[in-house]
Amino acid sequence: MAFLTHLLVCVFGMGSWVAINGLWVELPLLVTKLPEGWYLPSYLTVVIQLANTGPLLVTLMHRFRPGCLSEVPVIFLILCVGTTACILLAFLWSMTSWIQGRQHSVAFIVLTFFLALVDCTSSVTFLPFMSQLPTYYLTTFFIGEGLSGLLPALVALVQGSGITTCVNVTETPGTTLNPVTTMETSITQRTLSPSLTPLTWHLESRYLAPRFSPLLFFLLLSFLMGCCLVAFFLLQRQPWGRQGSIEDLLHSQVTLHSIKPRDTEDTGSVGAPVSSPGKGSVEVSVASLRPAQLAFIYSVVAFVNALTNGVLPSVQTYSCLPYGPVAYHLSATLSSVASPLACFLPIFLPNRSLLFLGVLTVLGTGFGTYNMAMAAMSPCPILQGHWGGEVLIVLSWMLFVACLSYVKVMLGVILRDRSRSALLWCGAAVQLGSLIGALLMFPLVNVLKLFSSADYCSLDCSA
């Protein structure tokens, strides 16, 4: 029975971000099909941030109208919306409309907004719901959340989404070049001059045909969202599924000073250290957290999510592609593997020391800084063209994700043991950090264009 519950919680957690993560890993294929081309990621960034109105509304409702909103029907609603949107996306993703004389993917963008609304709102509804279950299930929830990035990445890897190869292209000195604007690579259309001149050749990147279409990919996402909906329904039928709800959150003004600890039967007596079954005592006495410690925890939650959800994902292609498509796909896939593995670690090696978690945050930030530096140096970062550079960038991305994933899990466990309202504000901090990170990077990448891309096959950094 316990194993089944862990499985249901894992599947439930997987549904939190599986839809948007699926869209991101499918982008290399979508940008070659939709009229927005390589501007599509910019559109999605704006759309996803607009969807933060969902968690903002939920948080404000509980702040000013406590008790008027239960998380259970809200979760059922957003999961049904997410499943329906995925199914519609499978059949409507390529539909375009004319707006001001240009074609735009209106159906795709509108459905993406609903998927983003589902995933963003999950941060302030799924976590409070998890407070109804014993503490050790929260780690399983975060494992499922990590799988929400891994499973779509593996499917996209099997599909061959965005896989490129280097091909020889012959041309004459008199060739007329006509760039194709729908690709980011240097693929061009050429009109050969009639004069007989010596032929020259060079390497260019070409996209390989995917093994299956986006239709099947989005249907698989629909299946995963449907599994999450079924898992939540079954969790509701568990004995604790009817215990309390978000209605009792924030009955009084909620500030860092007024978040109350759980009853003594749930967290132990005031001032006593919290213990986990079979794991011995932990380093932080949850009931004795001071306002300054709570402020530190929420600040770290926002900072970590700003890095992992907003800042670094915006520059992953710039930091990895100069080392080649293999390094890029390994860093994307293995970092997705590192997240759920890091979420497993607290089961065996829990450490609630805020000092330790702070040091681990600094360490993860260091790996993120290396990734950002390589992106800023693109298209010719350190050790470009050397196997050591490829190994370093892949390891750096893996360790960056692993360190900060562990921090997120342990901070969530600490806040869960303090109160259910603390988990609600934890979800709000997650979304706030993600929003700040995305809004910070959008002008740097898309307006100021501080990062430069290049075609790996024709890249020459020997100068």
From Swiss-Prot:
A family per Pfam: SLC52_ribofla_tr
What keywords were assigned to this record? Cell membrane, Glycoprotein, Membrane, Phosphoprotein, Transmembrane, Transmembrane helix, Transport
Q: Where in the cell is it found?
A: Cell membrane
Cytoplasmic topology: which positions?
1-6, 59-71, 127-137, 236-294, 351-353, 412-421
Glycosylation-annotated residues? N168
Q: Which InterPro entries match?
A: Riboflavin_transptr
Q: PTM Phosphoserine: at which residues? A: S245, S269
Which residues point to the Extracellular side? 28-37, 93-105, 159-214, 316-329, 375-390, 443-463
Which tissues is this chain's protein expressed in? Predominantly expressed in small intestine. Highly expressed in jejunum and ileum. Also expressed in testis and at lower level in lung, kidney, stomach and colon.
* Membrane-crossing segments per the record: 7-27, 38-58, 72-92, 106-126, 138-158, 215-235, 295-315, 330-350, 354-374, 391-411, 422-442
Known catalytic reactions: riboflavin(in) = riboflavin(out)
How is the protein disposed in the membrane? Multi-pass membrane protein
Q: Which GO terms describe its cellular component?
A: cytoplasm; plasma membrane
Any keyword Glycoprotein? yes
Superkingdom is Eukaryota
* A GO term for molecular function: riboflavin transmembrane transporter activity
Q: Which GO terms describe its biological process?
A: cellular response to heat; flavin adenine dinucleotide biosynthetic process; riboflavin metabolic process; riboflavin transport; sensory perception of sound
What family is it from? Answer: Belongs to the riboflavin transporter family.
* Its job: Plasma membrane transporter mediating the uptake by cells of the water soluble vitamin B2/riboflavin that plays a key role in biochemical oxidation-reduction reactions of the carbohydrate, lipid, and amino acid metabolism.
What name is this protein filed under?
Solute carrier family 52, riboflavin transporter, member 3
Q: What species was this sequence derived from?
A: Rattus norvegicus (Rat)
